[in-house]
Amino acid sequence: MNLFPIVAGRFKLDGGAMFGVVPKSIWQRTNPADENNLIDLCARCLLIESSDRLILVDTGMGDKQSERFFNYYKPWGGDNLVDSVIGAGFHPNDVTDVLLTHLHFDHCGGCFTWNADRTAFVPVFPNADYWSNESHWQWATQPNPREKASFLKDNLNPIQESGRLRFIEKGKDNPLDLDLLFVDGHTEKQMLPMVDWKGEKLVFMGDLIPVSYTHLTLPTILRV
């Protein structure tokens, strides 16, 4: 098994929204804010290469939303999902499966993009199945007011309409042959892959620990 870190893009969010009750005097030591209190963030994904599958974990924000949307999140840097996959030595057509830790826009937005004349969405990974779990899918498609803005129909509908949406359920075998950790934070039934690699157990933390270093201590971890 081989692992390849993927960067799907970089953007900004309000530091107070990211760290909640943690005082700014603490979090700004590791995540300095700009004049608008925005901190730099990175959409990190993972490619898992096994003997018969190439699994992409999460897809970042994507590029199909409106200019107003992207003005809010202020993308920066030159990184993007497809270039990062190619940089790892693969082509988007090589990806067999896309495992979505959860369905917030910054984790599943890169599954689809516009076609050439911007009249329809097309898959970025045309040979891939999309994996979620039924509990989280229901949570995303019937969202509560708190999370509604994070679950975008332009992301979810194309996945469902593709006919390639698959569900993995807790405690049941799955075709991906991955151990999965199901957590109710920071959204319902987030699904985190665990991989045995070089004698270690690695866990892709998704948004359970969205910011390295700063979100590692118990008081700073997002709601579980």
Q: Where do the PLM segments sit?
A:
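Zn-dependent metallo-beta-lactamase
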Residues: 1-56, 61-65, 69-72, 170-171
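Metallo-beta-lactamase
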Residues: 76-90, 94-106, 121-182
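Residue-level marker for buried hydrophobic side chains located in beta-strands
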Residues: 55-57, 99, 130, 202-204
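Metal-dependent phosphodiesterase/nuclease catalytic metal-binding core
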Residues: 47, 179-181, 191-213
